[in-house]
Amino acid sequence: MKYDIILLDADETLMDFPDAEHQALVRTFGDHQLTLTPSIDQLYQQINSGLWKQFEQQLITRKQLLSTRFAQLFDTLGITGIDSENFNREYLFNLGYGSKTMPYAQECCQQLYQAGCRLYILTNGVAATQRRRLDASGLMPYFSGVFVSEESGYQKPLKEYFDYVFARIPDFDRQRALMVGDSLSSDIEGARRAGVDACWLNLHDKQPPEELPIRFTISSLRQLPDIILHGAESFQVHKDEK
């Protein structure tokens, strides 16, 4: 077994973030007598995604991201009389209820754990929120550690973040480590900067970029144990595996 130190992203790799996000938005909007329409939801996604990209590129701070996303949304919609920072705090609290996992996350982690792999979660999320979600997910018995960017002072894809993580994993060896995640810009790019192999969870059948060294590509966590435990390089993907 070449890889026995498995580094897994949280959102949209292990955890169903779109579901958690939607439920949290609906609840928070409802608490303020507002309705989350599909168009408002889409607008928020655009604003939030753009801010997270800026955060990954060190163009803004985490505090700026969290304090401005709803301010931008309300300003665009012409909504007044709501404290956007307080609204964000309420949203993060509600987001903490989102413990639904991705398909085959439980089975995958259990298989790898029972085979002797050491599993670690690497996430850019907000620490208190992520830990609540993970604690309620049922996944934590399989993991040896969780590294949240907020607690390290760095974020994926920065090499400093991975250096922080690697220094805290006993007997860490880059040759034995595999980074698994859905995000090309944070997980796969981060693995490149850190000098570890990467497995891309390609959930939406995207074309892989030529500039990133992706060792493996999967469309479902169901396929990950075959790569790690049996050295599979490729396999037939069935529609029901996603």
Over which residues does each language-model region extend?
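Short glycine/serine/threonine/alanine-rich loop segments
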Residues: 34, 117, 196
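Conserved phosphate-coupling serine/threonine residues in phosphotransfer and NTP-handling enzymes
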Residues: 123
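A short acidic, amphipathic alpha-helical/loop segment
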Residues: 104-108
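N-terminal helical cap/lid subdomain that shapes the substrate entry/recognition surface
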Residues: 2-103, 113
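Short, conserved structural micro-motifs that define repeat-unit consensus positions
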Residues: 113-119
